């Protein structure tokens, strides 16, 4: 368990967390990663959601389930390894990329087998 939270473990500075992992400044997150927001110019109040107004920064590491009831607004990136299931509408401004096969059958080229190729939306 100590390796999970340690400096060089799964969540530490050289694992999945900041500053050099998947969620760090040089990984999938801003400003240099795949999900950089510099070119998207998100407008204030996008999707009917206004700015938070508070100041703060933090990391959330979840092993297992994270049930959320209500509305959750995220400004930034949410790197996910595994599966995600949404029930209802998902408001997204910017781009969404899916690497792998999704259950919607997209990319099955009309054969209906759901054997979709990797897609980038």
Swiss-Prot record:
InterPro entries found in the cross-reference section: Chorion
A single GO cellular-component term on record: egg chorion
Keyword set includes Repeat: yes
One function term, GO molecular function aspect: structural constituent of egg chorion
Pfam families the UniProt entry points to: Chorion_1 (PF01723)
Alphabetical keyword list: Repeat
Domain of life: Eukaryota
Biological process according to GO: chorion-containing eggshell formation
Task performed by this protein: This protein is one of many from the eggshell of the gypsy moth.
Similarity remark: Belongs to the chorion protein family.
Name of the protein in its database record: Chorion class A proteins Ld9
Provenance organism: Lymantria dispar (Gypsy moth)
């Amino acid at each position: 368990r100590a390796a999970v939270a340690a400096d060089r473990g799964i969540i530490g500075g050289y694992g999945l967390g900041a500053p050099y992992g998947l969620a760090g400044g040089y990984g999938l997150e801003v400003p240099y990663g795949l999900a950089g927001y510099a070119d998207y110019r998100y407008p204030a109040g996008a999707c009917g959601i206004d700015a938070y107004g508070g100041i703060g920064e933090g990391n959330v590491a979840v092993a297992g389930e994270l049930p959320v009831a209500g509305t959750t607004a995220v400004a930034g990136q949410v790197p996910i390894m595994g599966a995600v299931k949404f029930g209802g509408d998902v408001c997204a401004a910017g781009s969404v990329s899916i690497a792998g096969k999704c259950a919607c059958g997209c990319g099955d080229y009309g054969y209906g087998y759901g054997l979709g190729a990797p897609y980038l939306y």
